[in-house]
């Protein structure tokens, strides 16, 4: 039995609240159970110097956690003068995931930054951030479209992410902290709405996992991402 008493293929309750920030062109408060992430999309009519003159835009992300998002206070990275390797890894993952489904030429020579701030952490912060960031990005692009800044909304399809792992010998979907901290294997899957794989991150914490176990995790992830994509679609219609 999972600590949360969920079925092995059952996700936590997921919700999206759009338009939560007054000034951002797009924003979303996403909740995966007790993991809450606030995402703000910011449009800038400028590009990184290395991208100027290439006729395409850019989508990037930044990620951080509030000091009391965790059980014990975590120092703000700004006070240390540098970002941790984990933070850099996660924000690059978010950016890659969103760019994989964005028509950067259709965006034009502009940049959209997704700021992902973890308000409360209970496992799966990066997967929640990616999934909520897609909603915020969609709303930012729709904001531009409504103002005739775009001819069409340059999103190819949905993208979402979910964690899976092996907990007490059993593959399970959407790990919370209690499961993630004791899992023999944990993995993150980023997939598109049509089933394309953007990225897989998997680690054996105790003993190596088999190919069959990997395929079991992949099957769980496909189910979870499919459900998340449907929730995204419902959210943007609301």
UniProtKB/Swiss-Prot annotation:
Kindly state which keywords UniProt assigns to this record, in alphabetical order.
Nucleotidyltransferase, RNA-binding, rRNA processing, Transferase, tRNA processing, tRNA-binding
SUPFAM superfamilies according to UniProt: Ribonuclease PH domain 2-like, Ribosomal protein S5 domain 2-like
Q: Name one GO biological process term.
A: rRNA processing
Entry's InterPro entries? Answer: ExoRNase_PH_dom1, ExoRNase_PH_dom2, ExoRNase_PH_dom2_sf, PNPase/RNase_PH_dom_sf, Ribosomal_Su5_D2-typ_SF, RNase_PH, RNase_PH_bac-type, RNase_PH_CS
Tell me the superkingdom of the source.
Answer: Bacteria
Q: What is its EC number?
A: 2.7.7.56
GO terms (molecular function) for this protein are: 3'-5'-RNA exonuclease activity; tRNA binding; tRNA nucleotidyltransferase activity
**Binding of phosphate, residues:** 86, 124-126
UniProt xrefs under PROSITE patterns:
RIBONUCLEASE_PH (PS01277)
| PANTHER family according to UniProt | EXOSOME COMPLEX COMPONENT (PTHR11953), EXOSOME COMPLEX COMPONENT RRP41 (PTHR11953:SF0)
| Record's subunit section | Homohexameric ring arranged as a trimer of dimers.
Task performed by this protein: Phosphorolytic 3'-5' exoribonuclease that plays an important role in tRNA 3'-end maturation. Removes nucleotide residues following the 3'-CCA terminus of tRNAs; can also add nucleotides to the ends of RNA molecules by using nucleoside diphosphates as substrates, but this may not be physiologically important. Probably plays a role in initiation of 16S rRNA degradation (leading to ribosome degradation) during starvation.
What is the protein name stated in its UniProt record?
Ribonuclease PH
What organism is recorded for this protein?
A: Azorhizobium caulinodans (strain ATCC 43989 / DSM 5975 / JCM 20966 / LMG 6465 / NBRC 14845 / NCIMB 13405 / ORS 571)
- Write the lineage as a comma-separated list: Bacteria, Pseudomonadati, Pseudomonadota, Alphaproteobacteria, Hyphomicrobiales
């Amino acid at each position: 039995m999972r600590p949360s008493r969920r079925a092995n293929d059952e996700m936590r309750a997921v919700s999206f609240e759009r338009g939560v920030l007054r000034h951002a062109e797009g924003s979303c408060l996403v909740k995966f159970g007790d993991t809450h992430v606030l995402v703000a999309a910011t449009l800038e009519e400028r590009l990184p110097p290395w991208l100027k003159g290439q006729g395409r835009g850019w989508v990037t992300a930044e990620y951080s956690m509030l000091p009391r998002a965790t059980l014990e206070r975590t120092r703000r990275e700004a006070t240390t003068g540098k970002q941790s390797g984990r933070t850099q890894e996660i924000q690059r993952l978010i950016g890659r995931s969103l760019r994989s489904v964005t028509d950067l030429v259709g965006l034009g020579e502009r940049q959209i930054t997704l700021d992902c701030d973890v308000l409360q952490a209970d496992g799966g912060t990066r997967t929640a951030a990616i999934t909520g960031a897609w909603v915020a990005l969609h709303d930012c692009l729709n904001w531009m479209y409504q103002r005739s800044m775009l001819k069409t909304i340059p999103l190819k399809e949905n993208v979402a992410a979910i964690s899976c792992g092996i907990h007490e010998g059993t593959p399970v979907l959407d790990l919370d902290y209690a499961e993630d901290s004791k899992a023999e294997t944990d993995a993150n899957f980023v997939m598109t709405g049509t089933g394309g794989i953007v990225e897989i991150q998997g680690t054996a914490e105790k003993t190596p996992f088999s190919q069959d176990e990997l395929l079991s995790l992949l099957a769980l992830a496909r189910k979870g991402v499919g459900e998340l994509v449907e929730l995204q679609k419902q959210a943007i219609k609301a």
